[in-house]
């Protein structure tokens, strides 16, 4: 049985709130905010059906300056967030009262009660979403193959043979080209996901007490159609009375069934990993909820674990840093993000159940004191404008 709020990701709170439109303020008709710069923080308010936007320089204890919310947005249980190379926002959305899920895309700078650019149904219970980070333009003389630009979504669908899976997309598309699933990946309630500069996948297994990394297959390019030369039209034959053949359903690609290239496990201090992020150096940050009912002073209490960037031959041991202790404010973290300056943001809740964002300075370690942002609702996922 999972600790704290992991099982339903705020399901009880969400059920009470997802049927109503956001009540965070009257923003109807506003669709473009200011020029939200790099490092602007976004946070999902899962039981308020909204995305909060925090201006750079928000003071300790401050709240959001803008939001995306309202009936036009189709948000009714936003979960996790990711930005693409155009700074468009992608959201996994799940409504526990209907068990319906959506993938939603919003235009860069969108605020208020806006129509999304894209909505697409998702099967199962989606959680984390991640997109390959933007890379510098390659040198003209470089012979290296370009890194594929991917998007990944952690998903759990109990109706299929292998319910735990990660959906693989070409970034900017809404139909997965493949999925990662089967006995070899050992996925066990995948939660948070991240992609590094080479599009390698990192995924937390909430019930598996580990974090795994995979080298994903490159999507096959879509072939360009060959032009057909024009010819003299032939007379149209008289239609046959035979019934038309039934269309053949397009088969779903067989899941990629591969072993991870490495795993970080309980031997390395993992207990209940939920969220994950990489910094610009590739260091791995894991939001771990710890053991059920373990207090902030317990060695098995909630923590942010930091492991070094992967390199071939590296044997992971204990984390190089561990943010943990009663001064941190950590309680039941669900996501972690690190901006380009190294500032660490954590989605969490207070002991009283209010959503909160904890903020730690670069290099934070041990029982570090956090500053905070207030949230109008339950916070599940975070996103930072690249």
Model region roles, listed by residue range:
Residues 2, 14-43, 220-222, 228, ...:
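Bacterial Sec-dependent N-terminal signal peptides
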Residues 24-37, 71-86, 122-142, 146-148, ...:
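Beta-rich, blade/repeat-based domains predominating
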Residues 28-70, 80-81, 89, 104:
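An edge-strand/N-cap motif at the start of beta-rich repeat modules
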Residues 141-145, 218-256:
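Ser/Thr-rich, Proline-interspersed low-complexity disordered segments
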């Amino acid at each position: 049985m999972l600790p704290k709020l992991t099982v339903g990701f705020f399901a009880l709170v969400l059920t009470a709130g997802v049927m109503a439109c956001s009540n965070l303020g009257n923003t109807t008709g506003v669709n473009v905010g200011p020029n939200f710069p790099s490092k602007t923080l976004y946070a999902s308010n899962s039981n308020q059906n909204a995305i909060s936007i925090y201006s750079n320089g928000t003071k300790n204890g401050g709240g959001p300056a803008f939001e995306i919310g309202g009936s036009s947005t189709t948000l009714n249980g936003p979960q996790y967030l990711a930005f693409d190379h155009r700074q468009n926002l992608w959201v996994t959305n799940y409504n526990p009262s209907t068990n319906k899920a959506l993938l939603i895309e919003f235009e860069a700078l969108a605020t208020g009660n806006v129509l999304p650019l894209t909505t697409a149904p998702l099967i199962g219970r989606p959680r984390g979403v991640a997109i390959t980070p933007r890379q510098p333009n390659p040198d003209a003389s470089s012979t290296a193959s370009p890194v594929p630009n991917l998007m990944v979504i952690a998903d759990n669908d109990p109706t299929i043979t292998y319910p735990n899976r990660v959906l693989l997309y070409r970034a900017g598309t809404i139909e997965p080209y493949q999925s990662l699933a089967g006995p070899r990946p050992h996925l066990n309630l995948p939660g948070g996901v991240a992609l590094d500069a080479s599009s390698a996948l990192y995924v937390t297994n909430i019930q598996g007490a580990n974090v795994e990394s995979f080298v994903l297959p490159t999507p096959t390019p879509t072939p360009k159609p060959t032009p057909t030369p024009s010819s003299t039209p032939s007379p149209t034959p008289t239609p046959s009375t035979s019934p038309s053949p039934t269309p053949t359903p397009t088969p779903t690609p067989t899941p990629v069934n591969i072993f991870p290239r490495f795993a970080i496990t309980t031997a390395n201090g993992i207990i209940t990993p939920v969220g994950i992020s990489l910094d610009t150096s590739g260091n791995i940050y894991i939001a771990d909820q710890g053991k059920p009912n373990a207090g902030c002073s317990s060695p098995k209490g909630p923590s942010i674990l930091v492991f070094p960037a992967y390199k071939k031959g590296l044997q992971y041991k204990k984390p190089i840093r561990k943010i943990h202790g009663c001064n941190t404010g950590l309680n039941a973290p669900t996501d972690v993000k690190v901006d380009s300056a190294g500032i660490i943001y954590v989605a969490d809740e207070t002991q009283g159940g209010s959503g909160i964002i904890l903020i730690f300075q670069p290099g934070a370690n041990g029982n570090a004191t956090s500053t905070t942002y207030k949230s109008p609702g339950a916070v599940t996922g975070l996103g930072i404008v690249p």
